Structure formats: structure tokens, C-alpha cells
Amino acid sequence: MALSNSTTVLPFLASLWQETDEPGGNMSADLARRSQLRDDSKLEALYILMVLGFFGFFTLGIMLSYIRSKKLEHSHDPFNVYIESDAWQEKGKALFQARVLESFRACYVIENQAAVEQPATHLPELKPLS
């Protein structure tokens, strides 16, 4: 891989600088060039404002269409009526309670017969290591 030489740009920049900054050059040409640059900068600012305006208009349109699509447009729609009613919430509560009862039925307790038969005996405990 060949390394690029960054010093090759310096003579080009020096010659460009000498062309733009000629001592004793024509002042009227400089003034005409500067006035044209000012006019171009006004057009550049106008172009930037136009691009930003189009971008803002486009963004606003997308935002408004998104907000409009999220509104409940068809209130007579059976699905929306069902969601607004509390019937599905009551059914959900009943289903949840049934599932909880099923899970309790599936659980069972293993009983230690020695502890039940001799409750007075001392059971060993773990002591904290503090």
C-alpha cells in the first residue's frame, strides 16, 4: 500500500493564494468579484432556507398523517366498541382467576413425617457467619 504525500498540496495552495491576493491588482475587478460573491451568498442562504422549508413541510405532513392514523376514526366499528366496553376486562379477570386456581391444584406439599410425629425435637438450624 502506497502512502500518500501530504506535502504535494502545499504548492497548489500557495499558487492559488497568490492568484487571489495579487498586490496592486485591479481594484474594480476585486470589487466586482466581491459583489458577485455577496449575491451568491444571498442565493445560497435562500437555497438553504428553501431546503429547510421543504424538509419541515415534509416532516410536518408525516407527523400529521401519523397522528391522524392513531385517532379512533370509526367509533361504530365492532372491534372498537368491544375494546371500549368493560366486557373483555371482566372476561380477562375470570380467565386469570381460573388459571390461578389451576396452578394451585397442580401444586402439592411434601410433608416431613418425622417432624410431624416428633414436633418437640430440636431441628438443626444454619447459623449466620457474621
From Swiss-Prot:
<keyword id="KW-0325">Glycoprotein</keyword>
<dbReference type="GO" id="GO:0071482">
    <property type="term" value="P:cellular response to light stimulus"/>
</dbReference>
<keyword id="KW-0407">Ion channel</keyword>
<dbReference type="GO" id="GO:0008584">
    <property type="term" value="P:male gonad development"/>
</dbReference>
<dbReference type="GO" id="GO:0043266">
    <property type="term" value="P:regulation of potassium ion transport"/>
</dbReference>
<feature type="glycosylation site" description="N-linked (GlcNAc...) asparagine">
    <location>
        <position position="5"/>
    </location>
</feature>
<dbReference type="GO" id="GO:0071468">
    <property type="term" value="P:cellular response to acidic pH"/>
</dbReference>
<dbReference type="GO" id="GO:0009986">
    <property type="term" value="C:cell surface"/>
</dbReference>
<keyword id="KW-1003">Cell membrane</keyword>
<keyword id="KW-0630">Potassium</keyword>
<feature type="transmembrane region" description="Helical">
    <location>
        <begin position="45"/>
        <end position="67"/>
    </location>
</feature>
<keyword id="KW-0597">Phosphoprotein</keyword>
<comment type="function">
    <text>Ancillary protein that functions as a regulatory subunit of the voltage-gated potassium (Kv) channel complex composed of pore-forming and potassium-conducting alpha subunits and of regulatory beta subunits. KCNE1 beta subunit modulates the gating kinetics and enhances stability of the channel complex. Alters the gating of the delayed rectifier Kv channel containing KCNB1 alpha subunit. Associates with KCNQ1/KVLQT1 alpha subunit to form the slowly activating delayed rectifier cardiac potassium (IKs) channel responsible for ventricular muscle action potential repolarization.</text>
</comment>
<keyword id="KW-0633">Potassium transport</keyword>
<dbReference type="GO" id="GO:0016324">
    <property type="term" value="C:apical plasma membrane"/>
</dbReference>
<dbReference type="InterPro" id="IPR000369">
    <property type="entry name" value="K_chnl_KCNE"/>
</dbReference>
<dbReference type="GO" id="GO:0086013">
    <property type="term" value="P:membrane repolarization during cardiac muscle cell action potential"/>
</dbReference>
<dbReference type="GO" id="GO:1902260">
    <property type="term" value="P:negative regulation of delayed rectifier potassium channel activity"/>
</dbReference>
<dbReference type="GO" id="GO:0005249">
    <property type="term" value="F:voltage-gated potassium channel activity"/>
</dbReference>
<feature type="glycosylation site" description="N-linked (GlcNAc...) asparagine">
    <location>
        <position position="26"/>
    </location>
</feature>
<dbReference type="GO" id="GO:0030018">
    <property type="term" value="C:Z disc"/>
</dbReference>
<dbReference type="GO" id="GO:0071320">
    <property type="term" value="P:cellular response to cAMP"/>
</dbReference>
<dbReference type="GO" id="GO:0044877">
    <property type="term" value="F:protein-containing complex binding"/>
</dbReference>
<keyword id="KW-0406">Ion transport</keyword>
<dbReference type="GO" id="GO:0097623">
    <property type="term" value="P:potassium ion export across plasma membrane"/>
</dbReference>
<dbReference type="GO" id="GO:0086009">
    <property type="term" value="P:membrane repolarization"/>
</dbReference>
<dbReference type="GO" id="GO:0090315">
    <property type="term" value="P:negative regulation of protein targeting to membrane"/>
</dbReference>
<dbReference type="GO" id="GO:0002070">
    <property type="term" value="P:epithelial cell maturation"/>
</dbReference>
<dbReference type="GO" id="GO:0031433">
    <property type="term" value="F:telethonin binding"/>
</dbReference>
<dbReference type="GO" id="GO:0045121">
    <property type="term" value="C:membrane raft"/>
</dbReference>
<dbReference type="GO" id="GO:0044325">
    <property type="term" value="F:transmembrane transporter binding"/>
</dbReference>
<protein>
    <recommendedName>
        <fullName>Potassium voltage-gated channel subfamily E member 1</fullName>
    </recommendedName>
</protein>
<keyword id="KW-1133">Transmembrane helix</keyword>
<keyword id="KW-0472">Membrane</keyword>
<dbReference type="Pfam" id="PF02060">
    <property type="entry name" value="ISK_Channel"/>
</dbReference>
<dbReference type="GO" id="GO:0015459">
    <property type="term" value="F:potassium channel regulator activity"/>
</dbReference>
<keyword id="KW-0631">Potassium channel</keyword>
<dbReference type="GO" id="GO:0098915">
    <property type="term" value="P:membrane repolarization during ventricular cardiac muscle cell action potential"/>
</dbReference>
<dbReference type="GO" id="GO:0086005">
    <property type="term" value="P:ventricular cardiac muscle cell action potential"/>
</dbReference>
<dbReference type="GO" id="GO:0071805">
    <property type="term" value="P:potassium ion transmembrane transport"/>
</dbReference>
<dbReference type="GO" id="GO:0060307">
    <property type="term" value="P:regulation of ventricular cardiac muscle cell membrane repolarization"/>
</dbReference>
<dbReference type="GO" id="GO:0086011">
    <property type="term" value="P:membrane repolarization during action potential"/>
</dbReference>
